[in-house]
Amino acid sequence: MGPRGDVILEADWVIGEFMKTLEQEGILENTLIVFSSDNGPVLNDGYYDDAVEKIGNHDPKGGLRGGKYSIFEAGTRVPFITYWKGKIKP
């Protein structure tokens, strides 16, 4: 699948094992799980690594203004996912 696909598959497996362990230990209902990310993308960081050229038409900031080191949306918003069995509805 390539590096990104491989990481996604590995993360999926590890998270599944983690969830199974919480369930087996009887603590899943008392555990709030939060997955978060770093704030904002940075491509033009002063290093010439072809990052800007390799990205093509992809917009890592999702159309938002700014980026890392910026006070605008793409620099301050942080995506996250939460799970809490029986407490947070999907």
Model-identified regions with their sequence ranges:
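A structure-centric signal for secondary-structure junctions around beta-strands
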Residues: G5, N30, G75-V78
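The substrate-binding groove and active-site-proximal loops of carbohydrate-active enzymes
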Residues: M1-E10
